Structures are given as structure tokens and as C-alpha cells.
Amino acid sequence: MKERAYPVYTVDKHAEGLLVGGHPWVYENDILHSPENEPENGTLADVVSTKGSYLGTGFVSLKSKIRVRLISRNANDTFDAAFWRRRVEYAWNYRKTVLEPADLSACRVIFGEADQFPGLTVDRFSNILVTQTLSVGMEKLKPVLFPILAEVLRADGQTIDGIYERNDEALRAKEGLEQNKGWFELPGETHPASTQTEICENGVYYHVDFENGQKTGFFLDQKYNRRAVARLAAGHTVLDCFTHTGSFALNAAAGGAARVTAADISAEAIAMAQRNAQRNGLTNMDFLCEDTFELLPLLEREGHPYDFIILDPPAFTKARRTVENAMRGYKEINYRAMKLLPRGGYLATASCSHFATEELFIKMLRAAAKDAHRQLRQIEVKQQAPDHPILWGVPETNYLKFFLCQVI
């Protein structure tokens, strides 16, 4: 190990166990000794055990409960531009390995801690990279890292016309960062005039509004789950709740569904879903601007004949303390869907909340089925697409549950 110049934090046995097990976060409560002179916010520091054993190097976040986010466990690493270029190349080559070539034009290029870029998300939508930066260390690294992102993809023959930042996320306040959004100025380049682009996924085209859409503009993690729905949808009458911009509904319609109803509480989302249907020439679709919690019991009372229902709601909980209320919400919509479906119908149901674990989700589905006097026959259980990799030792990276079942 070469001589180190970074400040040193000594952590307790609890933190040591987590770090050795693969987790990259050091909480302030687990720190036994801090450097005599506190490092500057967003700079690097080493982390060691009570015996002085090196555990890793990471970015310091002085305003967060997560005091250090590791970026390396190699004491000989030098964190220069070449280091970050290698890491971007590694992340991109991973996507090229696990995704089909056609899916590389709309994929998650960087998935935060799972790619060893703590607090950074980078999504590719055709010719645009859309970023979200949720840690002060990554915020300070942008002038070095973002040009490298564009350079690495371009060197691989990919067209990248600009980088757009979606930093309008409340979590930034926990890092002492302001909320904002706008184009990142790549040196010597001009960015596109439009903040919309088009992507193709599973043969379906989508308009993506990366300035105003949810998160970075489009949910890429369900790409292969949408394909599973499309395979099963042929000939069915489908209801897609929480449709957002129509992704599951469009896949069902393109897959040969007899009729698809796409519902969402957001008028803006429904307008974009209608635009996407027109773009794909799909005429077997209807659209409802409705609250799913009110819509499902109404449809049950009116006797609407749907035999395939899709439930892909936004996260009902983003904290452990609200899990119980969230599970009640998940149970309500799943119970209502099971009541509405005929025996032999199909239910695709998902949760994108890390705190709503698979164990809790299955328990909820069993309770909903019992109350609805139905049984569930499991067809497929899936997770997020592999461009959102799950890093063992970091449970926060394992968040998406997707169940495709027959209701009998």
C-alpha cells in the first residue's frame, strides 16, 4: 500500500461488517474517530477499522447522515481522469454484454452504487444522456466525469448530442445541494434546442420528455417485464393502471390485445400516452384520466369485462416508517383488480419500492387473494432489467418486484 494523503475515518465493528460485506456507505453514527481537520465537503477520505485495516476510499458528505460513500477498496488506486474513464468503460461494456444490441439506445448507463458511482444515475435516451446527481462527491466530479461519459460512448460509435441534468430531486437537500435542471455544457459544444427525443424499446416507439417527465423522463427498468406482458396479451381485454406514458399498455396493444384501456391520474401523462399510441399506429386503445383507487371499484360495480389487469404504481413508500401504510395501498389495488378479473384472467403487478420487500409483497398478494376469494397461479416473477444491476451486499439496489399471475 502506497503512502496515503487522504484524511482518515475510523469506524466501528458494525460499519466494518457492512463494508467488508460489500456495502459502500459509512453512516455518521458508525464513526469512532474523525480526522482532526474535517475534510472539505465532497472530497476524498480513507476509511479504516479499529485495528487500522484499510476498508476503502470514498467521497465525504458532511451534511448527510451517510458521511462517506466508498468508490474504491483498492488502496493503490489513483483517482484521476483515467480512473474514471476506466470505470465508465467498464459500466458501458457491462451493458453491451447483458443487453440486446437494440436495447443499448435506451438504457441505464450508470446505476449509482451498483456501478461504483455513488449517488449518480445516467440514462440514455437515444442521442441524449440524462443524469441525476444525488451526492456532493459526484456533483463536484461532473466537470471531469460528464465529458468522459460522452467520449466513451462516442468512441464506441454511439451518437450523443448532449447531456441533460435532472437535479430537481428533493433528496439533494440532504447533501446540501440545490435543486435544478438544464443542459450540462460540454466543452466546445452546443446542446440540442429540444428537450424531447424518441426511443424504441421492444419495437415500440416513445416520445420522451426528459425535461418534465417523471424521474429522468422514462422508466427503463421494466423493459423486459413489458415484453412479458406483450407475449401474453394477444386476444385479451387489458386494463393498464398507472400507465404513465403508456409503456405497458402500448406493449399489450402491439402484442395483439383485443382492446387496451390505459389509465392514469395525470392528464399530461395520458396526453403523452395518446401521442405514443398515434406514433405506433395503435388504434385498439382507450385512455382514461382517473385515479386507480377510485377507478377499480367503479369498474367492478359497472361490470367491465377486463381479463388482464396491469398494476405498476409509483413507489407507495420511500422510507421504512411508511411501509405499513404502503402495503395497505398495494393490497387495496390488488384486491380490487382480483375482484374485477374473471377466473382465468391475468394480473401483472409490481412495486418499485425497496422498502416493500419481496417477502412483504408476496404476503400482501396472498392476503388480497384470500379476501377476494381467489387463488394466484404464478407465471413469472421478475425484477428490474440488468442495466439496473443488483449488487449483492447493497440491498438498496434490489428494488423492483414484478409478478405475472393467473387469477383462478
Set out the residue ranges of the language-model regions.
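Conserved SAM-binding loop of SAM-dependent methyltransferases across substrates and taxa
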Residues: 245-258
